[in-house]
């Protein structure tokens, strides 16, 4: 299966434009929830007060620039639905509590990796990824929807924005092309805590600088970040979370891969052209297949960097997920666990 629809997991069906029937269901649902909302008014008010008390002075109204235009958030939201990949972790890192979230890597439980385990006070309603259940989202009565790291599909955005103000992908952020830094900035602004966001960013950037300083051998080295699914091999292009991670450590993404980049975050690599994966270091992630399907493949083993022993194949799903998720929580985990794996073959 191709990775072009989903950067992390076997793709489901693409999102489709909402039908007239869906609009009718959503409209009826919103009206119904409004009519019977008296029993939860005190809870909602309390949540709003608690949320507002954490906002920074002068933070609202907040404006977030997106591909779909500037989105204005008038007051700090109390009921946030975090749909984009890593959006829920961004909210949690900033002290928020999403009422709904998408589980992009099928972690189960609260839908977050072990680096964010235990941060929810109350488990969120889990929402689909490529095809979010719009009725389920509307039933949560959100006052803000976050979808900063997704496909950037116009129909998806149009449907979500009918439910609540929606912060979609940034300009140039189609197909999951947004870094943890930009995602943190956007979410922090929407939640009214931009200074807290900048503090988290500064802390994370220091961790990158410290890791890079500890491994001067990374500087200037070329690296290929690839994956294999049931459909075949591929490699990630510059501008994605994975490449941002390694570039901050001093690596340079494989120029031969970047030369073939299109609109997607990823290029397919045929078996006849696996030498395209060659670099000073080749790092591979198995998706939906055992790691041995990569490491034992004779054509992969013939790639010069692999043959020379300068390769890493992730065989730990947690490490792979941390490297892929690209949130302030997961990159800290990855810096601790993944960087030593990169260093070993370059000694």
Which residue ranges define each predicted feature?
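Extracytoplasmic substrate-binding proteins
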Residues: 156, 162-229, 324-347
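Basic- and aromatic-lined ligand-binding clefts that recognize polyanionic substrates
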Residues: 79-91, 196-256
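Proline-aspartate-enriched helix->loop->beta-strand connector
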Residues: 141-147, 165, 274, 279-280
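Sec-dependent bacterial lipoprotein signal peptides
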Residues: 1-34
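Extracytoplasmic ligand-binding site segments that recognize negatively charged/polar headgroups
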Residues: 106-110, 153-155, 170-186, 220-245, ...
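Short, low-complexity, disordered segments immediately C-terminal to signal peptides
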Residues: 23-27, 36-61
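Structured C-terminal subdomain patch of bacterial secreted/periplasmic proteins
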Residues: 277-347
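A short, structured surface patch at a secondary-structure boundary
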Residues: 87-136, 149
